[in-house]
Amino acid sequence: MNHSADETRKGLLYALGCYAIWGLFPLYWYPLNHAPIGADQLLAQRIVWSAAFAVLFLAFNRQKADFFRAWGQPKTIALFAVSAFCIAMNWLIYLWAITNGHVLDASLGYFVSPLFNILLGRLVFGEKLNRRQAAAVVLAVVGILWLAVPVGQIPWVALLLTLSFGLYGLVRKLAPLGALPGLVLETLLMLPFAAAYLLYAGRQLRDRKSVV
């Protein structure tokens, strides 16, 4: 019982830390709305550097064996290919939102995400909602409607962020690999596409400069 309580408390602290960091992200990304590159190149850069630092952290971690073992498991690779796609879409939408004046929409998306995860847990894994969780889900739906009805349109940015991140969390829960090895595997699966896109974008930029 004490072990369960400790794990719950630790999970809560980790979650609060993650959302505090995410809450500060706009302070870093928003100034880049004046940069001569779009969200697509920002995403590619983020993938490249995430892969580099993730591999570095794994090199000094005891979970290297789990990571290398995963490469020989096609089902695991397939699950992480799906999770990599989901998180790449999530990052792309988020970067576009922050650099195009949709900070509040992005914030709403990540506000609703934990509640959407609760709903997925109920529907997919059969987890039971207590009264507080059910009330939180209802309040989230009311909050979305409260923001959407006055402007006469659906908050697509928030909904897409919620959906992509929720599906990402669902796939990661199904994948039999720890957080750090999973992050390394995801970023390495995305790395070839990101690197190829950066090379393509750089060539396009050089061609435009040569024309000018």
Show the residue positions of the predicted features.
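Membrane-interface helix termini and inter-helical loops of multi-pass transporters
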Residues: 27-39, 66-68, 99-102, 142-145, ...
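Loop-to-transmembrane alpha-helix entry segments
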Residues: 110, 126-146, 151-159, 187
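Hydrophobic/aromatic residues within transmembrane alpha-helices
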Residues: 32, 42, 97-98, 123-125, ...
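Glycine-/small-residue-enriched transmembrane alpha-helix faces in small-molecule transporters
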Residues: 1-41, 142-174
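Specific transmembrane alpha-helical segments of multi-pass solute transporters/efflux pumps
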Residues: 65-104, 146
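Structural motif at transmembrane-helix junctions in multi-pass transporters
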Residues: 34-41, 92-109, 178-180
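Membrane-interface interhelical linkers
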Residues: 1-16, 52-82, 131, 183, ...
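C-terminal transmembrane-helix exit sites in multi-pass transporters
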Residues: 96, 113-132
